[in-house]
Amino acid sequence: MNIRLLAVFALLTGISLPVRAEGDIEWRHRATQGAVTLSANPLGLASRTAFYSARGFAAEAIRPYAQACGFSFGMQNGGTATLSTRLADWRAVGTDGRAVRLRLPAEWDLQWAKAHVPEAARIAFRWAQFQAENVFEAGDWIMGMATLEAPLSGSFRLVARYHDEKGNHEIVLDKLACGHDSSAN
Amino acid sequence: MSPVVGVPPAPTLALPDMDGKIIDLARYRGKLVLVNFWATWCPPCRTEFPSLGRVRKLFKSTEFEVIAVNVGEDMETVFSFAATPAFPVLFDRDALAMARWQIMGLPTTLVVDRQGRLALRAVGGREFDDPVIVAQLRELIRQGRT
């Protein structure tokens, strides 16, 4: 069962099996600013449904999440300064200037509580997400899934804000698009 | 791995192992202990897992131990991934230990020094037998002897 789950997660994250190192992850979108690298892969409905169903979600319960515009994100601190980032400060910006925030893991978890999703499934969900608040020491890196609060049609850019000892910064991923199973997975 | 600011005391950790026996971190006081939080569905966790066994072999068992804390999964799932690990695998089924240890993402690894304090932390995958990390561990063992 674990090999099957790994294969599903590989689909979700875009990695090639076997997984050997973080450098093996094939990211479709990547930006580097100074010592910070931000990466993303679009996620489709079928792969997310399969992954979370295998973790204990009923297909009906996970559907809103699987249908949302979702990505797997990776963020790495290749420098020596401590970085921090809050998902609440990230925005997806459409070509028309419309800005959409990302839905936080805790907001999804409230929905899972109301839907009586089993605790084990909620734990797996919680830790498979890009966490709401992250602190990166030298060499640290984090990956996880996240969804937009509302879909954006066409391409858009993701503006991710982070903080270090010199102040606030932005790193931008261009030309993102919501994933569709026919092309993204 | 990065130094933990203030070197605070390690939170408590007493969880069942793969045989259902409760293993308490306190029993390892006097040893350096590398505590790895992981899950089988987490690709970087799987990648780094073999290096936990390799790094354990580099040190005397009287000086160093590795503990892998699985988050939220059952024994069958873990057993099918790591049937006979060379170190204790503990089960944090409700993720309460993760909360106590203020873990912010998987995998996260902490090194508890011989005085039971949090000395080093790494967020994201590592190869723990990397010479740089091994040197950090050796230095902590050396400091603990003095």
What function would you assign to each model-found segment?
Chain A
Residues 6-14:
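Bacterial N-terminal signal peptides
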Residues 1-5:
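Positively charged n-region of N-terminal signal peptides that target proteins for export
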Residues 16-18:
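N-terminal signal peptide c-region/cleavage motif recognized by signal peptidases
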